[in-house]
Amino acid sequence: MNLLAVALGGAFGSLLRWSLSLLLRRADAPLLTASAATLLANVAAAALLGALMARPLPDSRLQLALVTGVCGGFSTMSTFSWEAIQWVKTGSWWLALGYVTASLALSLGASAAAYALAHK
């Protein structure tokens, strides 16, 4: 049952991330809009994870589905890394540095803030 909980949560999180990328996609700025979608997904997943870790749910399978499944499927380190490399390859070093810095700072901040708010 744990496997099913993670699989369903992961499928839902992945579909959320894909939907967000479709919602924000623009043909005239594909890397910019893809990076924005990844940033939003990672920050939102970090916030959800922070809140869930501060107040674990009584149902361990639901907790597993949300933490490992949804947060894991919604966030993406691999896409974030690939997009940062693409910014460098286009010669946009400052955008790459800004993207990496914003992604890390906002994700850590969102997770810490959500944890603090939920832990009260």
Which residues does each predicted region cover?
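Membrane-interface helix-loop junctions in multi-pass transporters/channels
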Residues: M1-K120
